[in-house]
């Protein structure tokens, strides 16, 4: 009788514990993970990022300071990946992954950094601020881009436009601002290389 009672008590505790564990619902992320990809020519361009919301805040010049580099997303690093070699800002980049950092400006052009190190921007912290010189030293390329005003965009979004299927336009849009850079998939160069093999 004692064994039966002990068994029933143990079984009850296991069932209640299991139900309680299943009843705990994980909250949705405030800045959900997002992914966008596009094939342009022979190249697949992919971006993995987290998508923060405006939530009534002033974004650029507010929570994102002018003149300070930013990880161009939330939570972790924003990563762009090219499946083949490409050209950005007139500089050839090898296939692979790069961190995207953006330095917004109150007026004029912004700087978009494609950084060789797929690490957190916080690895560049020095005395409580981003060490801009150290970050720039690790850039694969930094391009200047003029921001434009767009319709309200609550969540940060990236878009990749295939254009003429040779050169892609990569755009970051958030709040009422968009900024873009071009990625040349080097289709003509790759075609010439292919033809030269025969």
Region roles according to the model:
Residues 72-126:
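Mid-length scaffold segments of soluble, non-membrane domains
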Residues 1-26:
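Bacterial Sec-dependent N-terminal signal peptides
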Residues 61-76:
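Aromatic- and Gly/Pro-rich amphipathic surface segment
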Residues 24-65, 117-198:
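Primarily secretory-pathway and cell-envelope proteins
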Residues 21, 40, 88:
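Short, ordered coil/turn segments that flank beta-strands lining enzyme active or ligand-binding pockets
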